[in-house]
Amino acid sequence: MFEQPSSTTNTTTSSGSGSDSNHYFELGPRNPINQAHPTSVIVPPRQHHHQIHQQQTDNSPLTPCTPYYPSNAYGLPLFFGTDFLQFQPSDIPSPLTPNISSPLTPHPFGPIPAIPTNQIYNRTFTDFYSTAASSPMVQYSTVKKSSAGRKPKEEDNMEDDDDDKRLKRRQRNKEAAARCRQRRIDLMKELQDQVNDFKNSNDKKMAECNNIRNKLNSLKNYLETHDCKLSREERTHEINRLIIPPSTVPPSQPYLQHSLRVHPPRADSVPYSIRSGHSSSSSEQHSPVEDYKPSIDQLLLPPISCIQNIKDRNINSMPPPALPASTSAAGIHVITSIPVSHANSLHGRSENVFAEPERKIPKIELDQTLTSLTMPDDVERPSALPTLSRIVENQPITTPSRPFRLGGEYQNQTPQSTGNGLFGGPPGPFDLLSSNTGLTPSGQPTMNFVSTPTPIQPHPDADLRPL
């Protein structure tokens, strides 16, 4: 199991009290790693128990409490447990630590006796292990622990810091959980409030629906039990009687007027009402005849050609459609429109005519021309334009004559010539340039003016279109 010791192994023998001696064997050289802890083994010889007690009484430099076996950093033997696997002979090179030989230092308790190598290598590992375990001399070493590593004070500080962090993290988790629970409670409360509001609104709408349904049922019952005063024939007769007849006013009539001839009501009668069939004092039910209203198809409007110019009529009125004069429940005529009286009519008397809103003449906006932009502002429009006179006068018309050659000489055909020529003119040579050709005026022409009715003063109904 063990190899031969190297050259650096020191083997010595010392005699103790008695015939027997203890053999000491140093297993390997000391290196910087195991220098603090000596790795030596004390192999005591086989002897009786009384000899062991006798050796303890001698004044030997070697004390039995000093262990000489391989130990680890905590002072425990390497052969006890699984740490013996870490033990390596000194001759086997280690890949982690170089094999550096160092001189042996003497043992602090004295010289270490050498152990014969033949006794070590001849013994088995189990025998050696049992001998070392059963020997009462083997005791644990009291070597001081190394101070390498963290100090206890720093470890305490680290533990305190870890505890503080753990407590803070736990406190934060508690606060976060409390906030989460509060948010859930608030959300549930808000949802419950919404549910209550919806329930209340639903109850209100159900009550409204029930109320409307009750009203509908009451109206249906009223219609089913209602008895009309007029029969079907009477209703048909009244409706046929109220049909508007066609208009008999000719379109060529210069003046159109229309008014309702109704008898004035009595002093104790119902006042006028715009809507027929509704009075402030009548509380009884009215028949459909009194609430009759003509549709737009039954209204007969006069044609546009019947409306003449405002200068001819001097009034702006338009006849309304012929509306029937209804009768109220009290038997009093109620007009459906209010007549308007005009004092300044053509006939010089006030008549009831229907007022018509004045027609709006659209304004025609013309684009500005280049002439209007270049003309000066002081140029005014003339009040009259010169035109031809209406009096028929004899105006000479000069036209170019046709010269022709007669007998080797040119003759001029002019209607003004009164001689012995072709047209009564004097015979002789004809000068075309000295005669009137009609291309250029021979005298100042007479300009006649024709007066046109151009409006000078502005009038709201005047047509101010450009000439």
From Swiss-Prot:
Sites bearing Phosphothreonine, chain numbering: 440, 452, 454
Span list, region Basic motif: 165-205
GO molecular function: chromatin binding; DNA-binding transcription factor activity, RNA polymerase II-specific; identical protein binding; RNA polymerase II cis-regulatory region sequence-specific DNA binding; RNA polymerase II transcription regulatory region sequence-specific DNA binding; RNA polymerase II-specific DNA-binding transcription factor binding; sequence-specific DNA binding
Bias type Polar residues, positions: 434-454
Gene3D superfamilies reported for this sequence: 1.20.5.170
GO CC, one annotated term: RNA polymerase II transcription regulator complex
Biological processes, Gene Ontology terms: anatomical structure morphogenesis; basement membrane disassembly; cell fate specification; determination of adult lifespan; innate immune response; negative regulation of stress response to copper ion; negative regulation of transcription by RNA polymerase II; positive regulation of DNA-templated transcription
Bias (Low complexity): 1-22, 273-286
Domain bZIP: 163-226
Location of the region described as Disordered in the Swiss-Prot/TrEMBL record: 1-38, 139-179, 266-291, 395-467
Entries under PROSITE patterns matching the protein: BZIP, BZIP_BASIC
Annotated region described as Leucine-zipper, given as residue ranges: 212-219
Pfam families: bZIP_1
Entry's family note: Belongs to the bZIP family. Fos subfamily.
Summary of subunit composition and partner proteins: Homodimer. Heterodimer; with jun-1. Interacts with kgb-1 and hda-1.
Name of this protein: Transcription factor fos-1
